[in-house]
Structure formats: structure tokens, C-alpha cells
Amino acid sequence: MKAAEIKRDLTNIQKSMSEINDLAKERITGGPGSISTTSASAITAPSTMSQTTTSRLAPKLTSAHPSIDDLRGLSRQDKITQLQKKIRASFENLVDHDDSNVIVTLPDDDDCPHNHFGSGLNLTHPTAAQLSASGLSGSSKTIDTIKFQEKSMKTESKTKVVTDGFSSEQATSNSAEMKRLQAGDIDYQESKGASAMRNRLEVDGVKTEENAAVIKEALSLRTGDITQQASNNVAASSITVQSENFSADKKAISQSQQSQTMTSNGIISQEKHVSSASQANYSMSHKGVSSTGSSMITSSSQMSAMNGQMLKLADLKLDDLKSLTAGSGQQEIEQTINKYSNMLTSIVSSLQEDERGGSAITVHDVGGKKSQYLEKINEVIRRAWAVPTHGHELGYSLCNSLRQSGGLDLLMKNCVKPDLQFSSAQLLEQCLTTENRKHVVDNGLDKVVNVACVCTKNSNMEHSRVGTGILEHLFKHSEGTCSDVIRLGGLDAVLFECRTSDLETLRHCASALANLSLYGGAENQEEMILRKVPMWLFPLAFHNDDNIKYYACLAIAVLVANKEIEAEVLKSGCLDLVEPFVTSHDPSAFARSNLAHAHGQSKHWLKRLVPVLSSNREEARNLAAFHFCMEAGIKREQGNTDIFREINAIEALKNVASCPNAIASKFAAQALRLIGETVPHKLSQQVPLWSVEDVQEWVKQIGFNDYIDKFNESQVDGDLLLKLNQDNLRADIGIGNGILLKRFERELQNLKRMADYSSKDTAKMHQFLSEIGTDYCTYTYAMLNAGIDKCALPHVNEDMLMTECGIHNSIHRLRILNAVKNLENSLPSSSEENMAKTLDVFVSYRRSNGSQLASLLKVHLQLRGFSVFIDVERLEAGKFDNGLLNSIRQAKNFVLVLTPDALHRCINDEDCKDWVHREIVAALNSNCNIIPIIDQQFDWPEVERLPEDMRSVAHFNGVNWIHDYQDACIDKLERFLRGEKNIDRIAAMVPGTPGSVSYQRMHSNDSDYQSGGAGAGSGAGTGGGGGGGVTGSVVDGLMVAANGSGQANHQANRYRQSPSPARQRGSTSQLSGYSRAPSKRSQILTPYRTQQAALLHKTGAGSASMQNMMPLAYLPPRRSSAAGLGHGSGSGMGSGYRSHSVDGLLDQAGSTPEQRIAAAAAKVTAGSTALTNASSTSTLQPEEEVTDAALNDSVTRRDKHTLSPPGNVQQHRKSRSLDHILSKQTLAELLPPSSELADGTQSMQNLAIPMTPQPQRRDTSSSSKSPTPERPPQPAMERVRERQSPEGVSATESEREDQPEECLRHGNQQRASASVHRGASLTSNKTSNSSLGSNFSAGGNNKTIFNRTMKKVRSLIKKP
């Protein structure tokens, strides 16, 4: 019963307070006459307490109450009195008169929605609510008394005087009111006053009127120790004068607002805003002519001050920044700028005072850290940049305020403090605007670059983002600054971060390289080339993220515009990615895709991009036009299109818009329309279809205005323009000046290159010529007019090209004919397996998620000297390019990138429709060295579910890719590529399918520069069977192998010694002529599988490389036929032996030099006899008495003995025997004539027959007829190193006891004969140490050793 009554009484109180709340919304209404009222009321609620429960009516400041303005309408005395009575009655009902000791409790929250008294009345200002939430206000005292007071007063007066010709009237009105509410230690007070005055005067037809009004408001809220005050003063006045022919009026209004927050210690914050406006109008008429005029003046000022730091930065809400939109007014933007600029100034001042030790409110006093305040400033600036449309203005203004207040200097000082380093770097990354960059460069560039490099070395991704972001901004200052940043390690830090997988970091890297390309100048662009920047741009341009891809393409487009480095840039392959990007993206949509370019670039940045619009490279112009189109849309929204006129970009855009380049002209025309400029006449790319007017427009664009009439008179259209020759231009057009004639021909050649001949070119002649080179596209129209098509192309000869097609350049004719032959040979044939392996690595990957890893592998391998092919063009559905298959056939190594689900589409793909499936099968069929790169997230599918033709790929040794340890992974991959592996593991590999071909990695030490294979035994074989080669070319093949190996050693050392790309290509031209159908991308230095430790110098007879040791002329490699390769395939045992190298013949331990020379002569004779017999019989079986101990023993590099390998293990290591370096004349002297020869074979005697002299290699320093040079001092022998595989040491070197001479002779015969058959095995797994050890033992003195040996051998033979 009592509970119900209490609940009812509380409900009545709530209703009463709700009525007060509604009444507060009504405005004051006045009555006639003079009214003066005063009222006061007090409400007291006694409290009843006991030892168990206390009834405390404690209003909470955090409840939702109406604001201060809602209490201004309490004016009607009767309603207020009535409500007061209701409240008093409600409180009286709470006390039980029968039992004064009753315990009164509040109902539970579940029973009554009214949690406390006064829930319907807001006792706080909104700002007070924020202070309450932060713990600054709020008293926990119990409210036992609520006091409400109200006072109001109104006065009015009016006076009027009227006489003849005169009238005067005056009226005044004053009002004042005050309201106050007290509840415990909460005191809210509101006061308001208003005054109005009006005067009217009329004399002899002239009327004047004056009005004035003043309103003053004041609010005050005290909660605990916090006091908030606010005031608002408004004054307005107007005056009017009017007569028959004249009238004038003037109006003025001013407003002043002020608010402050105070504590017992003083003022925390204070804000003041003052604004005023005035307007004057007049009109006058005289004799029917009237004139009017008006003027308006407005002014506004705002002041904000803070005494010390905000005690709770977490409560500093950024709602006004969040609420700003693209439609926000300018006044709102200015107020926000002023507010936060003052806040930044105050915080920076407090931090500076704290650093000096003189701050009254320090960070330690409030229990915070300095980094928190820096992070708060960072948040403010970050949100300012994010505001749509106005973010550029907001961000720039706040960054300027930070610099002007000394905050930028403070941040640079903090760069050397470990505890504040990162938070300062974060803020620096956000505020490096143009002016701030200049300040940093002038006052502390080294500190900022150092902290940026430190951040990039941190494993935390957030640190890397900040570091690369700072470097991105610093590269946008000047050429000198770019040089300094590069010198301090900024560019190296950016390039290292290109390896990461974090999107934000890669975006900073791409933008940083684009900025460096624009601002760096020619000198810094050379530095970029030396650091292989174009190669590192490839994985960025190949990325899936559009922002990363775009700025990487932009960087490469700027670099390629520099003619000095254009050739190096083209090698990276990035330029091929530009056109697909610009054709698949819309400039306006791309501008909105990322905040990084949502506000556009600065004027200086765009000015440096203007020259790219005039680049000769079509890709560079396409991307530059795309960017200006994007910038035009952004600047139009900002109302800043005049910037394009200031940087002189209008004329450049007009030139591009009228050029025949379809892509660039489209974007340039769109940019001009957005700017508001007229679009010039558009020329189609279909030049053969041009009209006479189009030709005249083109002539005008290239600057030959004086000859436009001549072209008009001759009615030259597009067809005739492409047929013009030098005689026509001189005689018919009248270009007599030779230099002008050259200029016109140059422009005409450029036009022919970019022209579109699709209307007439059904045979794809333009595409065929462009693959040879861009200069060859100029012959397209002439060859089409000559009637050359697919059928006639194979029958074209040199006379036809010169006479019918007008190709007077003999070198161009030769290259075209070679391209025709290569086009015929590119079709699959029976000899396709013998195609020259001119490509080092083919990278296969899944486009959906493997492009980044694949492109990263490409860069790493190219930096280590490998030529790499990666497909960047997306193939059409149902089409598999034959050129891609040919690239796989020409590749020595096939790197398979296995990212998550990379083989998912291959499952049950029996028809071989998947591209990755096709590439794997092509690599298996081509006997490529297949190396899987396995991502950590990749899981192998069940082998049984894979198609049978690719199952064996699951059993290959691979490299587990760990992104954080890239260098180690690449080192292991390089060892695989160069032929070092764990033989035992590979030999024990189980084929994927029983009975199928065993696809195992084939690692030989063939020179990478031999085109047709050094040895003839490179034919196809299946299973474990061996095979012989064409014996007629054995010695020639050995010579080529020795020559190529020496070239490899020499070039590999040059690559390691010199960073210059130009020097790295120094000696490739002589050998590249023997390659077949070279690819455009195969211009990078080819790596070498044989890696020597001894440095081979380029000059000097005593330090000649292996190719200089050749006594005969250089012989081009011979290509063996398929029949020759299959000969002797049934005798696989003969290929299981090694032949001694010259080191083994010269380095017998425990003997004198004379004894070693005598032994060498005996071995030469025995080996030559065995080789002759082997050539006749085509097979040689190993001796049966070989023990198991001999089978398991390993062979050392120096002491080579007669040890037979296991019969079931194929040996596939090419060893440099004495035959590699013996001349044919010397062999003829050593071997006696033999007449018993088998058909189809050649002995050493046959090989000694003098041959037709071959052209001498230019770098050969001696021949067989040259005198023997003097013997220089022999260097110390290097310690023999153990051969290691990626998994560790794969073979051990052990010392052996000397064998009897008879056994040694027999072993020599076996190994000598094995050299005939060793090249035929396709599945051999083991490699020999003799070829690797030969150059180590030589120690740069190989030629001297050879000459010494030959001299001693000849002297021994001639002795009786």
C-alpha cells in the first residue's frame, strides 16, 4: 500500500517537472502599461534516515536534461504557482503522518522507469555534461534541498507630440528576468535583459525614423569546483530619412559571445566571438532620372585561449571536425580552423614550457605522457585532412599553425629522444606540407631522415608506414634535397621496404619513387638507375592495389622521358603495364578511391609533370594525360582551375588532345573540358584515312605552317602523306632547307610509328614489325602497299625489301629477314627439344594471388644477373599464346610460384585448360629445371587428384618462401639455379607416376652462352637410360664448352665487381648472335652456373680467361640432329664415367715435376687410345672387379683415381679434360694413325684433319701458332672447397691412397671414353667436381699451365 502511494507521488512529481519543462519553451509575452512582478519560492524536502536505508534524492548530471535555453520561458506566474503547489503537495505526501519513523525507499529500476527525482529536468549546461563525464564536475553530495527562484520586470513608456507641420513620437521598452535553480552544490543561474527604443520625426514632408534594441543574456553553472559562464550581447540599430525626391537608410547589428570555464585554480579555457555587419542604401531622383546605391560591411573575429593543457585529452571531442561535409559553409570552416589552431598553439606552448621546466600544469601532474598529446594533435590533423573538399584548406591551415607556434621545431628535437621519437615521427608524417618541408630542410633534415630510416628498420608495420611516409614527402622538395636524402640513406630505405607486403607501406614507397623521379632531376635519376630502381618498380606496378600500381607506373613514365636512361628503363618491363592501367580506369573514380590523391597535387608537383606530356614515348604521354584529367576534376571541385594556366599546362594539353594518340588525346580533351578550355581539332589514329584538312592540321601542329598551302594545293591526304619521300618533299612541297627536311622526316617517322593501320593491315604486319623494334613500324604501310601478307612473307628476299618496300637500310633488311626465319622456326617441330636455352628463368604464377611474389622473384633474380621472363599480359579465354610456350622451351629453369590454391584449378583438369597446368606440362616436356617456390599458406592437393601429366611436380625439391627472410630464400634459389643441390636427396626421389618419365632437375655446368649446346649429347631420353651423341663434334663441343665456361667466369666476376648496368653487358654482343629468336626481355646479363672464386682479369697474357686459352679459332656451336642424339642410347654405362681435367694430370702428390710430366704424357697417350677405341665400338663396360668401397668413395678435386661409380647412377657433370684445350694439331702428333674405324664415327685422328679456318674471336689473345709466352710466377694453390647444395654439403672430399699404375691406366681409359657419351643422359643427377676445380687450381694462370704442359709433353714425345 505504502509502496503504491510512493510510486504514485513520484509520478506526480515527474508530471509536474515535465510541465515546467514544457513551459520553459514558451517565449515571454508582455502586456500594456507598466508591469513589475517579483516572485520567489523555495521547496524543501525533508529527508528521513535510518541505520539501514537512506532516501537520497540525488540527481545525476549525466542524465538527459534540456539545455540552459530551455529555462527561459518561465513567465506566467499562475502556472508557476500552480506547479509549485503540486510539487509541494507531492513532497508532503511522501511522509506518512501516522508513523513518522517509517523507512522510505525508492523503487527498483525494474519497477519504476524514474530513477531519481528531477529526471525530467536538466540541471546542467551541455558543456557541463561533458565536464561531468570527464570527472571534473559532479558532487556526490546528497540533495536534500531544491531551491528555485524567478524574478522578472517590465517597463514601457510612450510620448507623442503633434503640432502644425510637426510631429514627434518616442517609445521605450525595458524587460529583465532572472531564474535560479539550486540543488545541493549545483547552482544554475540565468539572466536576460532587453531594451528597445523608437523615435519618429516629421517636419515639412521630411520623415526620419530611428530604432535601436539591445539584448543581453548571461548563463552560469556551478558544479563542485567547476564554474562555467556564458554571455551573449546583441545590439541593432537603424535610421531612415525620406523626402519626396530622396531616401536613405542605414542598418547595423553587432553580436558578442563569450564563454569561459573556471576552477578554483583559475581559468581553464575562454572563448570569445565578435561579429558585426552594416548596410547603407540611398536613392535619389531628379527630373525623372533616379539613381540608387548600396554598401555592406561585415567583420568577424574569434579568440580562444587556454591556460594550460587540457587535463583529459581523451575527452577532447572532435565532433565538429567529424560533422563537416563538402557542403559546409566557409564561416563554419573558418571557425573550426581558428578553434583547433588555438588548441594546437596552447598545447605546443605547454609542451615547450614543460621542457623548460616552467609549466604550471605538467604532464606528470596529470599522470599522462607527452606522446599522448602529440598523438592527439596527430589525430586532429589527420581528421582535418579527411574532410571532403575542405580538407586541403583545413589541413594546410593547421600545419601552418603548428609551424608558426614552434611545434615543428619541437618535433625535430624529439627525433633524437627514444621515448618521443615515434610519436613525433607520426605527427611529422602528417604535417609535411610545402612550407613545413622547407622549414625541415633548412633546420633539421638529417634528424628527420634519420628517424625515418630508423622507423623503416623496425619490424612493426606502423613504424614502416610512418618512415616511408616521411621520405615520400621529403622527396617533394627540390633536386638538392633529393640528393641529400639519397646520401643519408633514404632511397635505400624505400627500396628495401618495396619487399614488404603491407599495402600502406607499399603505397608510400610507390609515391616516394614517383616524387623522386619528378623532383630529382637527371643526376638523381642516374642514381636511381645505379640502384636498380626500375627493377624494383616492377613488383609495385604489378601489384593488385590500384594506388600502388598507379604511382609506380607514373615513376617509370617520368624516368623513361629522360633519353639518357631510357634504354635501362625499358629493360624493367614496367612500361608495358602503363597502357592496361589507363585503359581500365576512370580518372574521376580513381581520384576518389584513395585519400592520398583525393585533394590533388600541389602546383609545383604538377609543373614538373608537364614536360612528360611532350615525351616521345606513347606510354608516358598516356599516363601524364590521365593524371591531368584526374587533377582537372579535383581542382574544379576546389574552384582552383587557374592553376593549370599558371603552370602553362593548357597548351601542352591542347597539343596532346589534337595528336593521333587515341588514349592520350581522349584524356587531354576531357581535362580541357573540365578546365573550361576549348578542345582543338581531333586527329584520328587511322592516318591512312585522314582527309586533306586533317593533314593540314597535323602539319600545323608540328610547326610547318609555311607549307600548309603547299599541302592544300597538292591535296595531300593521309594515304599520300604516308607515301611521301624525300624527293616529293623537296620538289613538290618545296622544303629546300636540308635541316627542315630532316625535321619533317623525323616527325613523319614518328607519325608512322604511332599510326593505326588496322583498316588495311589484316595480316598483322604492324605487330610483326613492332616485335622487331619500334623503328621498323615505319615500314608497315610500304610493305602493305607492296602486297606482302602471311603467305608472301616467307618468300620475301632482300631485293624485294629494297626495291618494292623502299627499305634502304641494309641492317634493317637483314633483321627483318632473320625475324621471318625465326617466325617459321617458332612453330613446334621435331627438333623443338633442341631449341637453344637462351632464357635463364621462366616464372609461372597464379594471377589471382601470386603476382606480387612472382614479380618480387623477378627483381631479385635480375639483380643477381639472371635473365627472367614473367608474363604480364592477361591471355584471353580459350587462348594460349605460342610465344609463351616458346619462352618455356627456351628457359633453363622453370620457377613455379605456389601461393594458396595455386593448383586448385589443375585438379581434375584432364583437358589441360588451365594456364598454370599448361605451363607445368610444357616445362616438364622441355626438361626445364623445375623449382617450386612454396608460400607458407600453400597446401599441396592430393597427388592422385592432379592430372597424370603433371603429378611429378609434387616431388621436386622447392624453396619454402618466408617473406621476412627473403635474402636467405633467394640465396637458396640461386644455388638451385646454378646447379648446386643435394645429390642424395634428388637421386632418391620417387616419380609421381609409375612407368612415366622421371622429371628430375637437370643441373649441368654448361655455359649459359652456348646456343646449341656444347656437347652433342643433349638429346631426349626416357627413364634412366643413357645415350650417346654425335661423335663427330665431340672435340668441337668440348672447345665450345671450355670457351663458354671461361666467358662465364669472366663475366660473373665482372658482374660482382661493377654496379654499372652498362659495364655488366660488356661482352654479351659476341655470343648473342648465335641465339635463336632472342626475346626483347633477354637483354639482361645472363647468369653463369659455374661460379669461380679466383678473379679472372680482363687483360694480360698471364691472367687470361678460359676463352683466351683456346689455341684454335672460336667455333660456333653445332646443333645435333635427333638421329644423332638417339645413337647409342642403349649403352648407358659409358656415360657414367668422368675424364681427368688438366689439373688432375698436373697435380700428382708426392712426385717431382719431371715425374708428373712423364705421367701426364702417359695418360695423354692412354686416354687418346681409349677415346679412339670408344669412338669405334660405341660402348665400354666398366670393370667387374670394382669393390663396394670404391663405389661409395667420393672423388677429390686434386687426386683423381680410378674409382668407378655405381652402375645405376647417371653422371651428368661436364668435366674439362685435356681434350677441352688440346689443339687438333697436338692430338695428331700424340696419336698414331689408325685405319680401323666404324662407320659413322670419328676418332681423334679424324678430328685432327685441318679444317676450314673459322673467324677468330676478338677477345682471343693467342692462337695455336703464336709463340709460347714466358712463364710468370705460379700463384699459391687455393684450398679446395667442398661443393655444397642448398641443404648443406652434398659430397665429402677424402684422401685416397695411390693405386697401381695399371689400374690407373684402365680407369683413365674408362673416363676418357665416357666423355663421348656423357651428354646424352636426360635423367642424370650427379655432378663432377673436376670442372669446378679446374679454374680454382688454375688460379688465374691457366694459360701458363697449359703452355708449360704442352711444351713438356712435346719434349718427352720427341725423346728416343
UniProtKB/Swiss-Prot annotation:
SMART domains: SAM, TIR. One of its GO terms (biological process) is response to axon injury. Pfam families: SAM_2, TIR_2. Widely expressed in larval brains and adult brains. Transmembrane segments: none annotated. The keyword Repeat applies. Coiled coil: none annotated. The active site is at 919. One of its GO terms (cellular component) is dendrite. Residues 34-48, 1321-1335 have a biased composition (Low complexity). Disruption phenotype: Severed axons in wild-type flies disappear completely within a week of injury, whereas axons of neurons homozygous for any one of the three loss-of-function alleles: l(3)896, l(3)4621, and l(3)4705 persist for several weeks after severing. After infection with Gram-negative bacteria, the respiratory epithelium displays an over-active immune response with a greater increase in expression of Drs compared to wild-type larvae. One of its GO terms (molecular function) is NAD+ nucleosidase activity, cyclic ADP-ribose generating. Residues 837-981 form the TIR domain. Its EC number is 3.2.2.6. Residues 997-1010, 1046-1073 have a biased composition (Polar residues). NAD(+) binds at residues 846-847, 876. PANTHER family: NAD(+) HYDROLASE SARM1, SARM1. Belongs to the SARM1 family. The TIR domain mediates NAD(+) hydrolase (NADase) activity. Self-association of TIR domains is required for NADase activity. This is NAD(+) hydrolase sarm1. It comes from Drosophila melanogaster.
